[in-house]
């Protein structure tokens, strides 16, 4: 992509999700979005590493993806019970992302990475055959 072309994220082409925001975030949730999310977000402007395990600070042997995690309860449950798996959670709804960040912080999980826009873009970015089948 050239520097003059807008990124697909800014264009929003092909997006298939609903609203991005709900009620006003609490101070805690707004702080988590500002301070914690940048360290967990996947940067699709950079090429995906051939081994996605390199994106996690802990050793992971499997890669799983959860699209549309809502408030994150299921994603956190799975991440707690499968600490050898790296999880990519996708949720464009800011309020859901904030709820997940609170859970990740409370449970001190290191095997989760996040994306806050169109899941199709993340799926296109992932290397072929990188997601572990269940």
Regions found by a protein language model. Name each.
Residues 1-65, 73-82:
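S-adenosyl-L-methionine
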Residues 8, 109, 132-133:
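S-adenosyl-L-methionine-dependent methyltransferase catalytic core, i.e., the SAM/SAH-binding region
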Residues 62-124:
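SAM cofactor-binding core of SAM-dependent methyltransferases
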Residues 124-134:
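A short acidic, Gly/Pro-enriched loop at the edge of an enzyme's catalytic core
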